[in-house]
A protein has these predicted regions:
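Short gly/ser/thr-rich secondary-structure transition/capping motifs
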Residues: 28-34, 51-52, 125-135
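Residues that scaffold the ATP/ADP-binding catalytic core of kinase and kinase-like folds
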Residues: 18, 121, 133
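Alpha-helix initiation/capping motif
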Residues: 12, 42, 117, 129-135
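Structural motif corresponding to alpha-helix initiation and N-cap regions
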Residues: 13, 32-39, 54-58, 79, ...
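N-terminal glycine-/charge-rich "phosphate-binding" loop or analogous flexible N-terminal tail
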Residues: 1-48
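Phosphate/diphosphate ligand-binding glycine-rich loop within oxidoreductases
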Residues: 47-129
Length: 135
């Protein structure tokens, strides 16, 4: 019997196909007021959850007696009551360091843009002032 996984974040179709090959999947591209009740009902029979950006509190997870793992597609775990998950024996997986290199790249790009006055000079060119010196 396949394990039941509830996905609550938009995923690329090839990833969903791989997951569906191994598991019974209930899929929500996003959670909102219109589908929150259906999401809560789906969680009740789930063995695993995969998603991000939705607060999964005790009230929502208490009825999920078969739940064994939650995997968040994010670095942070602030939307989870980690102590409660530990009490229940529910594993919590996240993606630590996934943004480390991107953050460093952004910082260096901002440093260079600031040092070379990129935004100021781009506005200068857009305004048609490129025929004179910036100084």
């Amino acid at each position: 019997m396949k394990k039941h996984v509830v996905v609550y974040k938009k995923l690329a179709e090839p990833l969903l196909a791989r997951l569906r090959a191994e598991c019974e999947v209930t899929y929500f591209e996003a959670i909102d007021a219109g589908n929150r009740a259906a999401f809560a009902a789906a969680i009740r029979g789930a063995h695993g959850l995969l998603g991000a950006s939705v607060r999964l509190d005790r009230e929502l997870l208490d009825p999920a007696l078969d739940l064994r793992i939650i995997s968040t597609i994010s670095v942070g775990v602030d939307q989870f009551d980690v102590d409660y998950l530990r009490e229940r024996g529910i594993l919590l997986a996240n993606t630590p360091d996934v943004l480390t290199e991107t953050t460093a790249d952004t910082i260096f790009a901002l440093i260079l843009a600031s040092a070379r006055r990129v935004v100021e000079l781009a506005e200068f060119v857009k305004a048609g002032c490129w025929t004179r010196s910036v100084g």
